[in-house]
Amino acid sequence: MKQIESAKNQKVKDWKKLHTKKERTKTNTFLIEGEHLVEEALKSPGIVKEILVKDETRIPSDLETGIQCYMLSEDAFSAVTETETPQQIAAVCHMPEEKLATARKVLLIDAVQDPGNLGTMIRTADAAGLDAVVLGDGTADAFNGKTLRSAQGSHFHIPVVRRNLPSYVDELKAEGVKVYGTALQNGAPYQEIPQSESFALIVGNEGAGVDAALLEKTDLNLYVPLYGQAESLNVAVAAAILVYHLRG
């Protein structure tokens, strides 16, 4: 194991850069923090590149060959991590391969900008047993630190890929997958829609909703009725209600 004392060490500087999308894209790697996320990443062979700890006892046993471990001083570890009260362990991971096999139950996300909302929806899609999460233009970075923390390891369980949504919707429909949008106008209460063996659900931007051009391509648009005085539901909450209803 290598030890690093200084927060000015070049490795520390390189790891810190992974908080930026530019560096994540350049290196095809990302940083995770906390014991749970590291445990989930280690369940996927070939994902973890480096493990960073403050305490040697935090190093997981039975590591894959080739994973480099570093023990960092308090200052060096704090310089790398993003959370205010960081845990004792972090890891640098390779980006998962963007594989999108034949998907029969899919969540499509159009221009959702809040990383916390995105992470929650990835976690929901994983919990509901969907086949993939597909991100369109304008959607937050899936490997932003807040997105990763909100998803709680679901990035390692379900494909999260970027696609041109209009083109992908056309592909799904050609394969016989029913595509649902989310909109009040020309929409139906979700309770009226039967469960389905295959479906794609599109959820949209927190303020503007799903792009009008996408809504024109859907088979049907759904909404969650509001019975109180709230103007709307959080997009991640609405997505959870609809996904669980559609999948049955």
UniProtKB/Swiss-Prot annotation:
Changing N234A: Loss of activity. Its main location: cytoplasm. Disruption phenotype: Mutant strain lacks G2553 methylation in 23S rRNA. Loss of the gene does not affect growth nor lead to ribosome assembly intermediates accumulation. CDD domains: SpoU-like_rRNA-MTase. It is an enzyme of class 2 (transferase). One of its GO terms (cellular component) is cytoplasm. Contains an extended N-terminal domain, which probably binds RNA, connected by an interdomain linker to a C-terminal catalytic domain, which adopts a typical SPOUT fold. This is 23S rRNA (guanosine(2553)-2'-O)-methyltransferase RlmP. It comes from Bacillus subtilis (strain 168).
